[in-house]
Structure formats: structure tokens, C-alpha cells
A protein has these predicted regions:
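Active-site ExK catalytic segment of metal-dependent nucleases
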Residues: 9-11, 140-144
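N-terminal strand-loop-strand beta-hairpin
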Residues: 1-124, 168-173, 177-193
């Protein structure tokens, strides 16, 4: 998206990812396949997990030796559904000094999300097929278009429509993300689309 500090995305389980993969192989542009290890932290003076839904996530990522530092603040509608977040991210030359800084500042480690991610682009979407250790397979779609004035709820609806048109069968959406799924499996509320 043109405003690089806003992220519009959905994360879903699909009944059948094969039609999606076949569609992307024919019509999309394959970008990469990466092993990503994401470590999530909370601040010593402010517990991100104290609120529901959890809105803030602080992450360090190791993507096969390419490192990044990321903060997300999700915005939820009155029904607790997220359609976009404020996102700030930067590359890191070396992740270990940052981990030492976090430790010195008493940041609390929360969870590690270990996944294999295959990424394609198709029109205004980046489509990722994720195999997440201990959670299973997911599809994540992010808006990468240039229009800054798009309606996030409309765009996420178009993402679901895209998956339906491709023929993925039942689409089960969560609004909380992988770290929440791992930390609080008994609090999950899925929505069939």
C-alpha cells in the first residue's frame, strides 16, 4: 500500500488450498519461499496481553538470516474484527544485540512462531501460504496496492471473495493472528466466510 505504515490483511484457514496454489502458479507471480522464525515480546511497563482483543504486537523476525524489527497496532471494529493495523518495521543487520537490549530492558518474551511461507503476488494482493509449526496451514492475504484511500473492510471483503472465486471451499477466518492462536487457543473465535 502506498501508506507503508498501514497494513490491510486477512488470515484464514481454507478447506482446500490446492485450487488457490494452482491459480497462483498460473496467474500470479511467485516471489519466494522462506523459513521465518518470529519472536514476540511485551514491554516491561505495559502488558500487551492484558487487553482483549490483543491489539499490539512487538516482533523480531529471522527470515533465513535476514532480520527485522516490527511493531503492529491493530484497529478493531465494534464487533472485535480487525481489518487493518498501523505497522512500523525496519531491517536489522544483526538480531542478537537487539535481543540483548530487550533482555536488559526487561522485555518479556511471549511466544515463538516458526513457519514456512510461500509468497505470490496477484494484482493488488500478496498471497502467502503458511505452514505454521504447532498450528497448521493458513492463507494470509495482504493489500499491496497503491491507493491510500481504500476502505479496509471493503478490501478484506474482496480478499475473501477472491478465495471463494478460486474455489477454496469453506473459509475460516480469525482476527487475532498466529501469536494469539498459540498463546490462547481456548479463546479463539473463528468466523466462517
Amino acid at each position: 500500500m502506498a501508506n507503508k505504515n498501514i497494513e490491510i490483511e486477512i488470515q484464514v484457514n481454507v478447506e482446500n488450498s490446492k485450487p488457490l496454489i494452482e491459480f497462483l502458479e498460473k496467474n500470479g507471480n511467485f516471489q519466494s519461499e522462506k523459513h521465518q522464525v518470529d519472536e514476540y515480546f511485551s514491554l516491561a511497563h505495559r502488558d500487551f496481553l492484558a487487553t482483549r482483543p490483543v491489539a499490539e504486537w512487538l516482533r523480531l523476525r529471522d527470515a533465513e538470516g535476514k532480520y527485522s524489527f516490527n511493531y503492529k497496532n491493530w484497529h478493531f471494529d465494534k464487533n472485535g474484527k480487525s481489518h487493518y493495523c498501523d505497522e512500523f518495521e525496519t531491517k536489522l543487520e544483526n538480531i542478537e544485540p537487539v535481543k540483548k537490549i530487550f533482555s536488559a530492558l526487561n522485555f518479556k518474551p511471549l511466544v515463538v512462531v516458526d513457519k514456512l511461507r510461500k509468497i505470490w503476488t496477484y494484482k493488488d494482493f500478496e498471497v502467502a501460504i503458511d505452514s505454521v509449526k504447532s498450528l497448521g496451514d493458513f492463507v494470509e492475504i495482504e493489500y499491496i496496492g497503491k491507493d491510500e484511500k481504500v476502505n479496509p473492510e471493503k478490501v478484506t471483503g474482496e480478499m475473501v471473495d477472491f478465495l471463494k472465486k478460486v474455489g477454496c471451499g469453506k473459509i475460516t477466518r480469525n482476527y487475532v493472528g498466529y501469536p494469539f492462536l498459540m498463546l490462547f487457543p481456548n479463546e479463539l473465535k473463528y468466523e466462517v466466510q
